[in-house]
């Protein structure tokens, strides 16, 4: 029986998909030369004044609406004071006592069990710059391209009790952000970052234990591994009679360990106070109603609809709705006449593999949903076999070819003429007399062998159903 209960809360920083930064007109484009997207405002020069990007407010409010939050009609920016080389002003412009959104939730399912994870708050803030350390000349450089890029921080309640719940929560949160088109969810580029606050307490105890904050979690797998390690580390300390220190720890993926980075600060350490350069943000009720009406169908609702309308399994619906463009691709394929379950199977196997190998999103695939539907219908009609379809799929995907035209040009149509197949069946039986005798002696599993030989002889073009029928007659 477990001695301790794990308690986890998560802070997610999501970079918003605005064209310009939160308080200036500099571009937010990723991957440019260091300090290319910098101006006096985002570099913290004296005497400059920030101007709030209205789109940031809209995106933050829409995320709040999508997660059932109360969107406050008035919210206030505050200065979070601390020193770090990549923070040019000596403070971060964030929100503290009056955030834009509060009291929301996200529903997750782990191992068939549904659970609601509370969201404490969502607030707007600016990102910091980036330190670049050069071992060659023993210097550290500061790139301010990321400084002043708009973020929303989404703070959960400490409702999660294991790494599996955390990963499910993060995936659900990321899916909502992507569906809203307010964040691209790219963890590798830092558009979706998370910190996990992990603590243990004896089973049955109401009071929380001392927490450690885990950073450098840049993939869902790293989140899982880091929390597993941290839970074990804290349990060992408590078993030995020690006390867990409140601190920030950095996850090392290569070693699969966490190491102390610094003491964990409390809110009072940052000396928050309202930013005098920014007026309170006011959202009119009519504006909020407009934004609410613009919300798209969200992942949870679409998942339920896929199960109800298309007869998909919960698993298939979850996979297809995890990414908005995959869900839209699926619906377009079904609208073009593809059987829903068969389209789902082809998307999860062949299409997803090719997309991952090519590094492209479904919306950018040369093989359109209509062409995938055409392929599925060719199989259903008996024009080609599933085996042939799998063989030609890479070419169809890479070149965006029309399946019917490709099959006709290559002469790949399935052989469904019984007279044409009968000679192939007789040839295979004549070439394998021992197997024929064994089959007639009761080894009926050899049917698969005969079918395989005929498919080989016809280069996979024989109609499997007709082959079975002819074999039964010949061997009966």
Curated annotation (Swiss-Prot):
Listed EC numbers: 6.3.5.-
SUPFAM superfamilies for the chain: GatB/YqeY motif (SSF89095), Glutamine synthetase/guanido kinase (SSF55931)
Reactions this protein catalyses: L-glutamyl-tRNA(Gln) + L-glutamine + ATP + H2O = L-glutaminyl-tRNA(Gln) + L-glutamate + ADP + phosphate + H(+); L-aspartyl-tRNA(Asn) + L-glutamine + ATP + H2O = L-asparaginyl-tRNA(Asn) + L-glutamate + ADP + phosphate + 2 H(+)
Enzyme superclass (EC): ligase
MF terms (GO), sorted A to Z: asparaginyl-tRNA synthase (glutamine-hydrolyzing) activity; ATP binding; glutaminyl-tRNA synthase (glutamine-hydrolyzing) activity
Any Gene Ontology biological process: glutaminyl-tRNAGln biosynthesis via transamidation
InterPro entries from the UniProt entry: Asn/Gln-tRNA_amidoTrfase_suB/E, Asn/Gln-tRNA_Trfase_suB/E_cat, Asn/Gln_amidotransferase, Asn/Gln_tRNA_amidoTrase-B-like, GatB, GatB_C_1, GatB_Yqey_C_2, Gln-tRNA_amidoTrfase_suB_CS
UniProtKB keywords: ATP-binding, Ligase, Nucleotide-binding, Protein biosynthesis
HAMAP family: GatB (MF_00121)
Functional note: Allows the formation of correctly charged Asn-tRNA(Asn) or Gln-tRNA(Gln) through the transamidation of misacylated Asp-tRNA(Asn) or Glu-tRNA(Gln) in organisms which lack either or both of asparaginyl-tRNA or glutaminyl-tRNA synthetases. The reaction takes place in the presence of glutamine and ATP through an activated phospho-Asp-tRNA(Asn) or phospho-Glu-tRNA(Gln).
PANTHER family associated with the record: GLUTAMYL-TRNA GLN AMIDOTRANSFERASE SUBUNIT B MITOCHONDRIAL AND PROKARYOTIC PET112-RELATED (PTHR11659), GLUTAMYL-TRNA(GLN) AMIDOTRANSFERASE SUBUNIT B, MITOCHONDRIAL (PTHR11659:SF0)
Family indicated by similarity: Belongs to the GatB/GatE family. GatB subfamily.
Subunit structure: Heterotrimer of A, B and C subunits.
Name the record gives this protein: Aspartyl/glutamyl-tRNA(Asn/Gln) amidotransferase subunit B
Species of provenance: Solidesulfovibrio magneticus (strain ATCC 700980 / DSM 13731 / RS-1)
């Amino acid at each position: 029986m477990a001695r301790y209960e794990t308690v986890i809360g998560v802070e997610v920083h999501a970079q918003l998909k605005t064209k310009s930064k939160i308080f200036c007109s500099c571009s937010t484009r990723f991957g440019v030369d260091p300090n290319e997207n910098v101006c006096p405002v985002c570099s913290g020069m004296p005497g400059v004044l920030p101007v709030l990007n209205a789109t940031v407010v809209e995106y933050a409010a829409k995320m709040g609406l999508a997660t059932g939050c109360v969107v406050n009609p008035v919210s206030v920016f505050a200065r979070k004071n601390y020193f770090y080389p990549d923070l040019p002003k000596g403070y971060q412009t964030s929100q503290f006592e009056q955030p834009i959104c509060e009291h929301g939730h996200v529903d997750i399912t782990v191992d068939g069990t549904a659970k609601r994870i509370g969201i404490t708050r969502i607030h707007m803030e600016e990102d910091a710059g980036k330190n670049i350390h050069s071992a060659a000349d023993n210097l550290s450089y500061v790139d301010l391209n990321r400084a002043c890029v708009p973020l929303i921080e989404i703070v959960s309640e400490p409702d999660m009790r294991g790494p599996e719940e955390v990963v499910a929560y993060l995936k659900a949160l990321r899916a909502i952000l992507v569906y809203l088109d307010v964040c691209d969810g790219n963890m590798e580029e830092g558009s979706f970052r998370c910190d996990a606050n992990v603590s243990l307490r004896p089973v049955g105890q109401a009071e929380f234990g001392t927490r450690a904050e885990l950073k450098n979690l840049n993939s869902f797998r790293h989140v899982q591994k880091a929390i597993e390690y941290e839970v074990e580390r804290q349990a060992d300390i408590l078993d030995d009679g020690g006390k867990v220190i409140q601190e920030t720890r950095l996850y090392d993926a290569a070693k699969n360990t966490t190491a102390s980075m610094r003491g964990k600060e409390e809110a009072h350490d940052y000396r928050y106070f309202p930013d005098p350069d920014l007026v309170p943000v006011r959202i009119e009720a009519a504006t909020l109603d407009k934004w609410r009406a613009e919300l798209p169908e969200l992942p949870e609702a679409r998942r339920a609809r896929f199960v109800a309308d298309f007869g998909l399994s919960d698993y298939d619906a979850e996979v297809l709705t995890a990414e908005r463009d995959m869900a839209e691709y699926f619906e377009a394929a079904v609208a073009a006449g593809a059987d829903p379950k068969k389209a789902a199977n082809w998307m999860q196997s062949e299409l997803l593999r090719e997309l991952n190998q090519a590094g492209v999103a479904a919306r950018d695939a040369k093989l359109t949903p209509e062409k995938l539907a055409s392929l599925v219908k060719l199989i259903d009609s008996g024009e080609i076999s599933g085996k042939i379809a799998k063989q030609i799929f890479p070419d169809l995907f890479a070149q965006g070819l029309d399946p019917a035209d490709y099959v006709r040009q290559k002469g790949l149509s399935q052989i469904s003429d019984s007279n044409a197949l009968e000679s192939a069946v007789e040839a295979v039986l004549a070439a394998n007399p021992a197997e024929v005798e064994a089959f007639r002696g009761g080894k009926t599993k050899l049917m698969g062998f005969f079918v395989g030989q005929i498919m080989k002889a016809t280069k996979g073009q024989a109609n499997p159903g007709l082959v079975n029928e002819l074999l039964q007659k010949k061997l009966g």
